[in-house]
Amino acid sequence: MKTYESNEYDVIVVGAGHAGVEAALASARMGEKTLLLTINLDMVAFMPCNPSVGGPAKGTVVREIDALGGEMGKNIDATYIQMRMLNTGKGPAVRALRAQADKWQYHERMKDTIENEPNLTLRQAVADELIVEDGVCKGLITNTGAKYYAKSVVLTTGTAARGKIIIGELAYSSGPNNSLPSIKLPENLEKLGFKLRRFKTGTPPRVDGNTIDYSKTQEEPGDKEPRHFSYTSKDSDYLEDQMSCYMTYTNTVTHDIIRANLDRAPMFSGVIKGVGPRYCPSIEDKVVRFADKDRHQIFLEPEGRHTKEIYVGDFSTSMPEEVQLKMLHSVAGLEKAELMRPGYAIEYDVIEPWQLKHTLETKNIKHLFTAGQMNGTSGYEEAAGQGLIAGINAALSAQNKPGFTLQRDEAYIGVLIDDLVTKGTNEPYRLLTSRAEYRLLLRHDNADLRLTEKGHELGLISEDRYKEFQDKKQAISQAMEAIKKVTIHPTDEVQEYLASVKQDRLNAGVSGADFLKRPRVTFDAVERLSGETLATDRYVKEQVEIALKYEGYIKKEKTLVDRLHRLESKKIPVDIDYNAIPSLATEARQKFEKIRPESIAQAERISGVNPADLAILTAYIQQGRIAKVKNK
């Protein structure tokens, strides 16, 4: 095709899903002239699978995005139809906020935000080829022949890269939700030397809410107490008129239908070659893997206020449509459910993420960044977190400034990216609280305290918001000092309260801080029993309560973090030749050469590397015996 010279930009972002919109907004807000390309303008920030945001670990990522100046938290706070805090009976490290989204409003508001952002141009086009000169990405060419030049390029192709939808015996080339696939770009990446692999994900059927018998299901309403993802949202704006979700179960009849049709299931017939997500298996996969289970939980989730489409959660399937109908009709409440959209599986290309730096810049092509599902992750939140980091670094690269990274002790986003670039992934990667060594430090409630300073330094947090943040920090400090000074005496009222929360009697007066450390004792109780007002903001009270109750555990984690920082400070020269290091185990040498860790701490996290290998590597570097990589 004949090409033509189009406009020039500082940063170009390819793909306007959850990664792409964060990347483009971050770049534009940092002052860079930014172009955002999407295959379809009607699918900006679209939710092709679950109409929700948040959940364990993921909810914390949304808070981190917000604390850094990203958009996802604000967008869901403006468009949710239900909000719930999960794991409220557990400790603060695993509490998680989850919102049910109006998926159409979510898309519309995000598109509106992008269209009204200075420095940002939104355009519909398919990126076919990168312009690369001397190992540096200079721009791209679209399917219409337009040549766009830029200082940095961010790729966020999602599941569109050579996407293939599969429903039973039917298979066809497609992106998510029957959008156009991206064919030429992944082919171009392979020609440029990138290693790609094939992953698979899936989505459940949607049914007509008018045809569900909700009397046979269990209602799951939202929370009455105000909850928010964005630190800028006000309690007074909390939605009272929320929509409920409903819970039901599969049964032995459902499982028998699935087992009788496994020969037609693409997952088991060999049609699907891509590796699927371990933590979001299809219903047919669950029935086979957990054959001893008589039933599996299903959530019926509304997709918005102005649609009757209901998402049948935890029922992902690629069975033939007729089998899907039989499966649905065997479930309590869905006996007469009308299918509106069948479930499907989608196969797509991903880049092997060990080919990336922690900035999400590719190692072999400068000024080229990748983010989101194309890096091997699953989930909107994981994508958005990566998109934000890639967008920040694309802007910094365009400004010739050093890159921005988050460490494992600073954010779940840091854990996610480090896992990807250090370990790679053999399946769609899902962020879990168990992946974070320092999860008591990386809580849902303190993302602003961890990251707002960084967002402000990057220019993504306004001066007004930064002042509010500083005021909150000061209020926490003042409340902490005040509660240490107040004394709780062993009065009858105090003893009665302690008995009500199943705590031992008080024998002598103690400080309010020591009193609060007792299990089930609350900050409000300290105020009531002391007769003192120590804080007025409930979020300030929450910070003081957590800091005191978990003081010992937090101190232990900070000791571990100090060790991490010492190892992170031991940098590995970029040009080291691992083949020149004597006594290094073959497996360690191969993995060091492939991943090329940036520090001893990162080298330690590579699977298959033992302490002896680390000791040899450390000694080699300290002795200054660095062998230069020979020019090939």
From Swiss-Prot:
Signal peptide: none annotated. NAD-binding protein involved in the addition of a carboxymethylaminomethyl (cmnm) group at the wobble position (U34) of certain tRNAs, forming tRNA-cmnm(5)s(2)U34. The gene is mnmG. Disulfide bonds: none annotated. It comes from Lactobacillus johnsonii (strain CNCM I-12250 / La1 / NCC 533). It comes from the Bacteria. Residues 205-231 are annotated as: Disordered. FAD binds at residues 15-20. This is tRNA uridine 5-carboxymethylaminomethyl modification enzyme MnmG.
